[in-house]
Amino acid sequence: MQAKIVALSAIAAVVNADLRLNTNGIPSDCNAICRPIRDLGNICTVNFIPGQTNNNSDQLQDELDAQCVCTNSSFDVKNLAAQCSSCMSQKVPSDQQRSLEGINSIMSQCGFQATSYASSATSSANTIIVLATRLTASSQLTTTIGGGATPAPTSERSRTSDQARTTTFLTSNGGGFPSIATSTIGGGRETGSPNAAAGVVAPGSNSVLGAAGLAVAGAFALGAFML
């Protein structure tokens, strides 16, 4: 009986895994390296409307969040998450360990390998533009997310969305420009570049960009201007 209780507790721990980083919980020394991961988590987090007919269970929400975060290829999520995790582990005071829950969930859910924080990585992190599509329905789950430290080979990822909401965060290189958020709603299929995320197995697909492609192209043009 006790073994069953432990097993059920482990399953329950997977549900409601918040993949967002609380801005107030990120030490100032880690702001730059963690900013892309924080923005990605905020973009990807699903907030179902109460009563929405979308099989809106906690488990589905976790799966949608995890696929969005773990398979993102707009920047090196695997490396930045590990760098952020290392920095926060070093800088977060012992009496504020709950601040690590978000980044720990990302590392665990995505199966990313730990690494040592290098302050030199912050310069490249400051120039990162985070592009992501928030998933909203079970029909968009096309990727199997497997936690653990063993990388799984992947080629390319794609996901089809009947009603995809593309949210784009544009950030400057630290020159004082404000972040800009844009969102475009439109159908179509989004194809990503090779994803090297550990623990992620993505089905191969060959497709044409839909309306979301316009937002991405515009984002890069504006991003180049800001930089």
From Swiss-Prot:
Compartment(s) where it occurs, according to its Swiss-Prot or TrEMBL record: Secreted, Cell wall
Glycosylation, residue list: 55, 72
Keyword check for Secreted: yes
GO CC annotations on file: extracellular region
Keyword tags: Cell wall, Glycoprotein, Secreted
Disulfide bonds: none
Secreted found in the keyword field: yes
Start and end residues of each stretch annotated as Disordered: 143-162
Name of the molecule in the record: Protein CAP22
Natural source organism: Colletotrichum gloeosporioides
Gene this chain is encoded by: CAP22
